Amino acid sequence: MPMYVVLSNFTEQGRTDIKNTSDRLDRLVPVAQKLGVKVLANAITMGQYDVVTVMEAADDATIAKVIGTVLSRGYVTTQTMRGFTVEEFRQVTQSI
């Protein structure tokens, strides 16, 4: 399944309720699973982004449903990128 990397930043609401971030990330897993998405990793980060999440989904529309659900809660803003494993990238670049 395609991999997606989601870069998140806390909104004012997310910063105000930062102590519950871990619980919200835990609740993301079953919500994503119900929509057919597997959460591979969540990391709280320092620097430009506050949270990095790696997920697998069947397609862009499926990941968009999860991201829309997350955004509707108002705690973060996101940027989503399609990621490739090293092996996927190797297959893409073999013909170059």
What are these regions (language model features)?
Residues 5-9, 43-66:
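Short, well-ordered beta-strand segments in beta-rich or mixed alpha/beta enzyme
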Residues 19, 53-54, 80:
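Short N-terminal micro-motifs specific to bacterial/archaeal maturation
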Residues 1-34, 38, 46-49, 84, ...:
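Short S/T/G/P-rich N-terminal loop/turn motif that feeds into the first structured element of a domain
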Residues 39-42, 78-80:
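Generic structural signal for residues in well-ordered beta-strands
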Residues 57-84:
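An amphipathic, aromatic/His-enriched active-site/gating alpha helix that lines ligand/cofactor pockets
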